[in-house]
Design a protein with these regions (language model features):
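Formylglycine-dependent sulfatase
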Residues: 10-229
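Bacterial Sec-dependent N-terminal signal peptides
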Residues: 1-11
Length: 229
């Protein structure tokens, strides 16, 4: 995601998370070749830092909980994918990066979490958990995957609605709308967690990428999943 800000003097942070994107799809790691087109990531790489000795939990919820709290999964209790009400979920009493920045940093931050959550099940009693854990704004979906990128449920500060804008586009739109409300008196922290490229694989809007040669049929997707990655 690229945008122009008038906030360069502030220590603003945007943490972008891609879902189910392994380094085996990225040619800028040793002995690996691009199997997916990632032009924006490659552009970021030219002015950024590439870490080559980094480890994370191999599945979604423990990895997110680790980034969120800075603690191992045996500490947070989130040791596997959260798939049902019986799955261990993140204790809202955990100290999070959002709480630290919003409530305890020398200069307090505005905070937002936009996109996939997957630290709790999506039940009404938990819709405000992201806010309770340090975010001024939460807008996204709690589940491990959305069944349809063109229609899904969204929780926004404890209220559910149905979204019919393509999920990746809606996530960016929500982020830009929130950043437009920021000012130069207070820095911001944005956790931006895309559902993509997690399955279900599908034909994305032609306005976002080159879809030539892709039919979008279930047969083609099953036979050539990497083309839809």
């Amino acid at each position: 995601m690229f945008a122009t800000f008038k906030l360069q003097a502030q220590q603003n942070t945007i943490l972008i998370i891609a879902d189910d994107l392994g380094n085996d799809y990225l040619g800028f790691y040793p002995n690996l070749g691009d199997t997916a087109k990632v032009p924006n990531i490659r552009t970021l790489l030219t002015t950024g830092i590439r870490f080559t000795r980094v480890w994370a939990a191999p599945v979604c919820s423990p990895a997110r909980a680790g980034i969120f709290t800075g603690r191992y999964s045996f500490r947070t209790g989130v040791g596997n994918v959260i798939s049902s009400a019986t799955s261990p979920q993140l204790d809202t009493a955990e100290m999070s990066i959002a709480k630290l920045l919003r409530d305890y940093a020398p200069q307090k931050y505005n905070t937002a979490n936009i996109g996939k959550w997957h630290l709790h099940v999506q039940t009404p009693a938990k819709w405000l958990y992201p806010n309770r854990m340090g975010y001024d704004l939460y807008s996204g979906n709690f589940n491990g995957q959305i069944p349809n990128y063109y229609q899904y449920t969204r929780i926004k500060n404890g209220v559910m609605d149905t979204v019919t804008t393509y999920a990746t586009t809606q996530t960016v739109n929500d982020a830009l709308a929130w950043m437009d409300t920021m000012n130069t008196t207070k820095p911001f922290f944005l956790w931006l967690a895309f559902n993509a490229p997690h399955n279900p694989f599908h034909l994305p809007p032609a306005s976002l990428c080159d879809t030539s040669g892709l039919s979008g049929t279930a047969t083609d997707i099953s036979a050539n999943p990497k083309k839809y990655f």
